[in-house]
């Protein structure tokens, strides 16, 4: 059953163009037509191997990112632990609960705001020395527009042999700055 959210009641004037996943309109989960072409265009635009649109927004993308990192970890005998900046979105916490992952928080000194979490590469490196984390998770840019030094944090993660996972939900534009500030261009794994 497919139904547009406006339920056929016109209020913006564009509802007759609002179609959903019906024959000939392509489907997000099985893209073959215009959506597949758009994903291909996005891959070329961003310069990445493959783009797949999420169907449930950033929350689903966070779950997917954590699941992929969890599957790639080498030590599967220990309970999985991830090192994370404390300003992570609640979808990250829900994903950790769903995947049975423990969180060890990066708590920067002097940060008084719940939204601000100005972590440094040094803090990440120190945290990784004390942790058996399979990955590091940060939000960049955060809810206040701040972005830590991803290039240096990614280097610290690589030195420790763990991937850097970045929630970049508020930073799609970063690819188009010169030079690019996109987390993947700066060394993040996902």
Where in the sequence are the language-model features?
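Short, functional N-terminal and low-complexity linear motifs
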Residues: 7-11, 30-33, 91-95, 121
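Generic structural "secondary-structure junction" signal
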Residues: 3-5, 21-24, 30-31, 146-148, ...
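N-terminal glycine-rich, Lys/His-bearing helix-loop that initiates the first secondary-structure elements
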Residues: 1-17
């Amino acid at each position: 059953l497919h139904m547009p959210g406006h339920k056929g009641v016109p209020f913006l004037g564009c509802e007759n163009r609002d179609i959903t996943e019906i024959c000939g309109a392509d489907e997000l989960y099985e893209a073959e037509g215009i959506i597949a072409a758009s994903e291909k265009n996005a891959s070329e635009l961003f310069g990445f191997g493959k783009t797949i649109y999420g169907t449930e927004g950033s929350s689903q993308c966070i779950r997917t990112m954590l699941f992929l990192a969890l599957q790639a970890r080498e030590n599967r005998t220990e309970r999985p632990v991830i090192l994370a900046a404390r300003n992570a979105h609640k979808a990250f916490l829900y994903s950790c609960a769903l995947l049975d992952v423990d969180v060890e928080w990066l708590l920067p000194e002097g940060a008084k705001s719940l939204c601000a979490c100005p972590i440094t590469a040094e803090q990440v490196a120190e945290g990784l020395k004390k942790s058996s984390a399979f990955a590091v998770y940060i939000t960049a840019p955060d809810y206040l527009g701040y972005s830590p030094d991803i290039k240096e944090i990614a280097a610290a993660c690589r030195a420790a042999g763990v991937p850097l996972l970045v929630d970049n939900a508020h930073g799609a534009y970063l690819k188009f700055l010169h030079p690019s500030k996109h987390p993947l261009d700066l060394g993040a794994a996902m």
